A protein has these predicted regions:
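Catalytic strand-loop segment that frames the active site of acyl-thioester-processing enzymes
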Residues: 1-36, 40-43
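Residue-level recognition of specific faces of alpha-helices
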Residues: 19, 26-29, 57, 92, ...
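HotDog/MaoC-like acyl-thioester-processing domains
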Residues: 3-6, 39, 70-71, 82-136
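A broad, structural micro-motif
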Residues: 21, 56-58, 102
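Generic structural detector for well-ordered beta-strands
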Residues: 7-11, 64, 108
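Short, basic/aromatic beta-hairpin or loop at an interaction surface
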Residues: 48-56
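Active-site beta-strand->loop segment that positions catalytic residues and contacts the acyl thioester
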Residues: 59-74, 80-86
Length: 136
């Protein structure tokens, strides 16, 4: 499966006093990348919550900050599936400037029902993933 790539521009609001991207903002960047990846598959997360009572939640993030990004940098967030099971999906996400990896993270997502309890990943979501890569 090819990576989904989402462009991100670094704005002044993203930087700290030193003029580099504040560390927590990388998590915002990869969240945007994940949300756009899901949207690109035709999954409407608002409708999924409304109709099935299911939402995605981040269970775990393991992150490495490798090099700084700076004001006005044009970045790209790359999102790829690492593993998927009935109840969770693990994504490999990177933030790049040109071909240089600045930040990498492995993110574990789970599905929660309307009561906030873990549940199986929605079938429609699993079908969309299967359409992307028949080996999953």
């Amino acid at each position: 499966m090819d990576a989904y790539v989402f462009p991100v521009r670094v704005y002044y609001e993203d930087t700290d006093l030193a003029g580099i991207v504040y560390y927590a903002n990388y998590l915002k960047f990869i969240e945007r990348g994940r949300s756009e990846w899901v949207r690109s598959m035709g999954i409407d997360q608002v409708a999924m919550k409304r109709d099935a009572g299911v939402v995605f939640a981040v269970r775990r993030v393991e992150a490495d900050y490798l090099q700084p990004a700076k004001f006005d940098d044009q970045l790209h967030v790359s999102t790829m599936i690492s593993t998927i099971s009935a109840a969770r999906i693990v994504l490999d996400q990177t933030v790049l400037r040109d071909d240089v990896v600045l930040f990498s993270a492995q993110v574990t997502l789970v599905a929660l029902d309307a009561q906030g309890r873990p549940t199986r990943l929605p079938e429609a979501f699993r079908r969309k993933i299967a359409d992307l890569d028949t080996s999953l």
